[in-house]
């Protein structure tokens, strides 16, 4: 039963009631799950369109009734008379329809009821009367629940309030919903549920459904555009022995039938180039790739990539194709080439700006790398500017780090960044005029890299030398280095024509064109950390088919601390006055994301009880993924001075427990009872 703090019945009780209703239907021989099909003649948007057209045909330009000079009763009578006349004309030639969908609203009024039915195209009101469908059917309808799926046959009419509706003559329960739908999604916890239970999200939020309909349209228009340029769509292997074509860590697995270790592809590149060698002059593939990396607002380990290759052109040709395609997508999908993302207008109709990487750094950082000749000079400059680098890094790597630090965040309007350093582009053709640079570009929009394109390297000798350097990088600890691919080198030795190639992140493109804030908002089922407990048994939280057991006690886990090593305690005392100046507070994690271009840092948005969000950065990404920390209650020191990290001010420090175990450092973020409110002070 409902308590004083909750007017809604207990969810488990509601589920039991629904189960009882289903049992009663089955006992009466009305099991909805025995129905195998239903004849749908129209979707809801079509019903509206055909009725409006029919109405215009029969009523023409009949003016609305003029009630000027009438008193309230006269006006009401006049309006009713006009409605009845219109209704009589329309009902004389009724349009019969049959549609189906999920019931999202129901209002029972004695012998008649209204309900809203949602299908793929929208919602439609249905008028259900006992006289029209019969006593038994109406009695069953009154017992129905929100979430049930119905088929409705009847004729279209317009209500007195002006809403186009369907007057039901026959209703059929097609599926009984045994789970209780939420009223709406809101807050952090529900955001997590939206991603985990996307099927519920699609039911409750029409704008989410619209996003994924638009995603499908975007991919369809990409294919239409490329088909118009005589490209051929192909499919290449997902499981590969050598995951090349990009700088990323692969997922690894074992192929039992062949007894071989294989990897999931991180790119589509090398197989598509083999097809260019084979004489397929224009090829593309849209497919899933997998990179064993972090999760944040713009990255998901499994994502959709589109790569295309065109023989007898170069990166200039790829720029023209990219600019034309983006313009085509904006116009066909959004209806305009001037789009808005997060309140910022982005003009895809104007010619895209073109800027070399060195010129961009010169413009935004005031450094001219064309005058810097050695790796040592570049490293010294990086130290001077406080840019972190690894000892193995070359001048080319430092140039890239400078670009990421100073330039990316400035690139809002479409900009081609061209002519990258050779060191970071192992599959790209050198510029004839400057062998330290390559014919490569990246398109940046809204600070994001939208695509990456090359004049493809087709010299097998040069390619072998670059693979050798990548192998050395791997030996020196570069986990993202590519490895020598002998079969690909053999393909190049057969002969590959001059070729332009490009890769597009489809998910990021969809984010841009749908104004979606995070990559998870454009992935139907994004990667999520598994929940403890029930989900580990392949269940979803509290399912209707099997009610959860309550108050089940589990035996405490026995922990072996015999191999644990901790730092010695401090010998120096701290007086109470000094200690009391440290402000320890409970904080709630509102958001948590990986910091771009950092493998260690997580950025926390915290509720510290003041009403103003607090940002704290913590180098714990090796131990936690961002999504598992959202909603947790942590402990922070809040009165430390702000400290800039990766260009972000970190205002405080989160407390963690650190120890060593078998030579490996272990870390546990200090999490406390969620009943502790944000801002509670620790003593």
Over which residues does each language-model region extend?
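Metal-assisted phosphate- and nucleotidyl-transfer catalytic regions
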Residues: 244-250, 328-447, 469-496, 536
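Short, conserved secondary-structure segments in the cores of folded domains
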Residues: 93, 137-140, 498, 575, ...
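Phosphate-backbone binding interfaces of nucleic-acid-interacting proteins
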Residues: 544-683
